[in-house]
Amino acid sequence: MPAPRPGTPVRGSTTGRPLMAAMDLFGRRWALRILWELRAGPLGARALLARCEGLSSSVLYQRLRELTASGIISPSADGYELTRLGTALGHALRPLDEWATTWAQEQEPEQEPEQEPEPEQELDDQEPTET
């Protein structure tokens, strides 16, 4: 599947809106994790595989191609690194991260108010039963 491009239909949208293309790209397995790992500096494929437990090399190379074609990362002497657009993306995602934290807190199950315990009757207050 080719990298999503603004102006063309993408999964879930035929409008070609840039936001929809970006959401399609970032919604692909491991895409955001790869970008997260590159935030501190360049990494090679082996380092990315080691940091992303469960990521297969075929999916890694597919995502690297898509992110490179989209101008978000670029090959470097040390592997792959964020471009100017990739760095700007990190800054743009901070408000979404803050929103997601608030959302997660509001998703915590509400605790039911504690109910008053039933008053216990003392044994002396009970009527005797016949046996």
Residue ranges and their predicted role:
Residues 8-10:
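Short, flexible loop segments at the rims of nucleotide/cofactor-binding pockets, characterized by
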Residues 2-5, 16-18, 90-131:
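Amphipathic alpha-helical dimerization/coiled-coil segments
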Residues 3-6, 53-55:
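Intrinsic disorder/low-complexity segments
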Residues 12-59, 65, 70-72, 80-87:
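N-terminal helix-turn-helix DNA-binding core of bacterial DNA-binding proteins
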Residues 75:
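Short beta-strand "wing" residues that participate in macromolecule-binding interfaces
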